[in-house]
């Protein structure tokens, strides 16, 4: 006997044709909260990420990447290019509250699972579409990746040292932020559908989600008309000051700090800098020291 799932999303069924990380994590999170998630995979190997990451086992190797991003999800193989495969998909959609995919816009329509098609089958359906660059515009049909999202949003520049090329981080911040925003959008749309009987389409993108992570930096840039990286930096390095940083001291001991306005004044007082900073109009915690000339002006 199969045990009934529990959790706040118990009783919700989601069907997804999503792959990779940004496309699958929202539904993994739904499964964690009790939803039944059915993942549609292609014939001849299924989701390509089944062969990504570290593989354990011999004949039936298990992928660390796939397991990380598809935990608790059921899987079925369908050929959605065939009439029979699409007919089975449509029957599943009739029984589901949520459908998700991360295909390019034209591919979803070409394969018969775009929003306009599926909402005719179930008007209350909550439909999520994850893309690289959004549904409209010149890049809409281009494939997107986490690295591209980090680069176009400015995150890759923020990771780099001054004068060095852009550098993407080890953590898939564009993929994961997109997944979390998609998850939040799905929950909001589910509440709306429960209250009104009308479904909604949730659209997210890798670049748009990564730009959200740069929000405070970009807002401060507009207000101060400064470089978005050095002018509004939260996390500091030895070369680029910030209000938070992680270093190793001369003995290798990790040093971590983050300042708020009160601690900033106390620290500058203790170092004997506060009066000098006030005289030069540079006592604002958010001020970034952008050049040697600026440093000399304030601290010289």
Language-model features: locations:
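Short Gly/Pro-enriched turn/cap motifs at secondary-structure boundaries
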Residues: 66, 229-239, 245-246
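Aromatic-enriched alpha-helical interface/lid elements that frame and gate functional surfaces
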Residues: 243-300
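N-terminal helix-loop segment corresponding to the beta1-alpha1 unit
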Residues: 1-198, 222, 229-230, 285
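Active-site-adjacent elements of ketosynthase-type condensing enzymes
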Residues: 213-235
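Glycine-rich beta-alpha junction loops
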Residues: 44, 132-134, 206-211, 251-253, ...
């Amino acid at each position: 006997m199969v045990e009934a799932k529990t959790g706040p999303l118990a009783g919700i069924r989601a069907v997804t044709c999503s792959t990779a990380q940004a496309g699958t994590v929202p539904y993994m999170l739904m499964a964690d909260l009790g939803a039944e998630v059915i993942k549609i995979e292609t014939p001849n190997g299924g989701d390509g990420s089944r062969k990504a990451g570290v593989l354990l086992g011999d004949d039936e190797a298990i992928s660390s990447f796939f397991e990380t991003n598809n935990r608790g999800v059921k899987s079925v193989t369908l050929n959605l290019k065939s009439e029979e495969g699409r007919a089975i998909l449509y029957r599943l959609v009739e029984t589901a509250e949520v459908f998700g995919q991360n295909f390019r816009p034209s591919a979803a329509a070409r394969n018969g699972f775009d929003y306009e098609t599926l909402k005719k089958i179930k008007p209350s359906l909550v439909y999520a579409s994850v893309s690289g660059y959004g549904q409209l515009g010149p890049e809409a049909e281009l494939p997107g990746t986490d690295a591209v999202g980090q680069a176009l949003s400015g995150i890759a520049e923020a990771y780099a040292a001054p004068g060095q090329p852009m550098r993407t981080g080890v953590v898939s911040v564009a993929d994961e932020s997109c997944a979390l925003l998609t998850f939040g959008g799905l929950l909001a749309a589910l509440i709306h559908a429960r209250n009104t009987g009308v479904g909604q389409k949730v659209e997210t993108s890798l670049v748009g989600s990564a730009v959200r992570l740069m929000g405070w930096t970009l807002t401060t840039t507009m207000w101060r008309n400064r470089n978005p990286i050095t002018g509004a930096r939260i996390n500091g390095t030895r070369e680029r000051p910030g209000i938070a940083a992680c270093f190793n001291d001369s003995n290798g001991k990790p040093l971590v700090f983050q300042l708020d306005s009160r601690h900033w004044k106390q620290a500058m007082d203790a170092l004997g800098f506060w009066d000098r900073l006030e005289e030069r109009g540079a006592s604002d915690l958010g001020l970034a020291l952008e050049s040697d000339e600026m440093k000399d002006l304030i601290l010289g």
